[in-house]
Amino acid sequence: IIDIKKSKYKKEEWNTFLKEGQELTIPAGSEEIVEIDAGEEMTGYLHLLLEAGKGSKIEILQAESYIYDELCGPAQVPLKKDRCDFVNGHLEGYTDEYLAGGFGTEEQAEEYETFWFRTFRFIHLKIKTGEEDLTLKSFYYEETGYPLKIATKVKTSDESLDKIWEISARTLQRCMHETYEDCPYYEQLQYAMDSRVQILY
């Protein structure tokens, strides 16, 4: 958890839920809003397991970074400075919405899974319960991508370049699925020159 916008639970309790599967129960007629940091950009299928909570509305927004209200450039796009700045920035991105059916039990959870992989570094999770308590049993992602064997490495006297190598390898990993793609978050298209550079690795 990078930030709690609105919650009856503390950050430690949310982290225990995410990392260890300790259930959280959200009372009827209440709202929870938290933001989660995956640590790096990921591609994966999101899974949310629920018990009861019929009529609860769940929004899962996926974002690459925090952005600012300030617009820049001729296209007037939101400014990205410190991509982890949750104090001054906010998250914008693609959102999945789910209305809980309420049929999840202690033995057999109701499960929401995305139909296609999602790309994210940050997730804005908003839950608004209806007339029933909702128990969150688990929330995780199943990482996906074409297996990439890192066959080379770069070593220099400048240690700051090690991070650039890691970012480059991770970028390639995140852009390999059924096809090579220019980026996993936006177009997900197979442009000729992007693909050629990727194939050469």
Description of each model-found segment:
Residues 186-191:
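Glycine/proline-enriched, intrinsically flexible loops and inter-domain linkers
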